[in-house]
């Protein structure tokens, strides 16, 4: 995880209304995402995750590149939870609230009984993942594994759920500095 650790120490931190926001290639697509970093992250996820699932699920937008690479390597179909409604039969809307925004997301092509692996870039406030897990639980799926690349240590909406989250690296961001735990 040498590349990931290096990139975290080099990542800019910006203030978003009092929230220290990490700007990182994995979680934001800027600065540029080098193939070596993406490869390192995908290999590590593959070594730690359970791929005995029916579908890999990733929220738009920054989970897509990770889930795509994993789908290509494992031949497990990919479902993207979108920020836009398509009005398709069976579409499920969910409301997410994070430390810096609120919005709706939409789930398609997920059915009761599906075994799911959720992949995302960053767990910070947990609002996105908690909303997704709640909706997938309501649908009747079996969430087999939840993997994030970066977990920002602190209170998270995921703490209130019965789902464990695996992270490749845990960090704190304080006074504009990233510390790897």
Curated annotation (Swiss-Prot):
Keyword check for Disulfide bond, yes or no: no
Under which main EC class is this enzyme filed?
transferase
So what EC number does this one have?
A: 2.4.2.-
Per its UniProt record, what InterPro entries does this chain match?
HGPRTase-like, PRibTrfase_dom, PRTase-like, Pur/Pyrimidine_PRTase
Q: What does this protein do?
A: May catalyze a purine salvage reaction, the substrate is unknown.
Which is an annotated GO molecular function term of this record? transferase activity
What this protein is called in its record is: HGPRTase-like protein 2
Return one Gene Ontology term, BP aspect: purine ribonucleoside salvage
Give the similarity note. Answer: Belongs to the purine/pyrimidine phosphoribosyltransferase family. Archaeal HPRT subfamily.
Record the organism: Haloquadratum walsbyi (strain DSM 16790 / HBSQ001)
Please provide the record's keywords in A-Z order: Purine salvage, Transferase
Q: Which PROSITE patterns match?
A: PUR_PYR_PR_TRANSFER
Q: Where are the transmembrane segments?
A: none
């Amino acid at each position: 995880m040498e590349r990931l650790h290096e990139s975290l120490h080099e990542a800019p931190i910006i203030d978003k209304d009092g929230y220290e926001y990490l700007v990182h290639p994995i979680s934001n697509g800027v600065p540029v995402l080098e193939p070596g970093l993406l490869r390192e992250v995908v290999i590590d996820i593959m070594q730690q995750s359970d791929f005995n699932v029916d579908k890999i699920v990733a929220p738009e937008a920054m989970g897509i590149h990770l889930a795509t690479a994993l789908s290509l390597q494992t031949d497990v179909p990919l479902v993207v939870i979108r920020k836009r409604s398509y009005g398709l039969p069976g579409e499920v809307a969910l409301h997410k609230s994070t430390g810096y925004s609120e919005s709706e997301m939409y789930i398609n092509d997920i059915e009761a009984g599906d075994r799911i692996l959720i992949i995302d870039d960053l767990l910070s406030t947990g609002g996105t993942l908690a909303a997704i897990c709640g909706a997938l639980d309501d649908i009747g799926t079996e969430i087999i594994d939840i993997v994030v690349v970066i977990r920002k240590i602190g209170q998270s909406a995921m703490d209130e759920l019965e789902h464990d989250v695996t992270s490749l690296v845990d960090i704190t961001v304080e006074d504009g500095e990233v510390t790897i735990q």
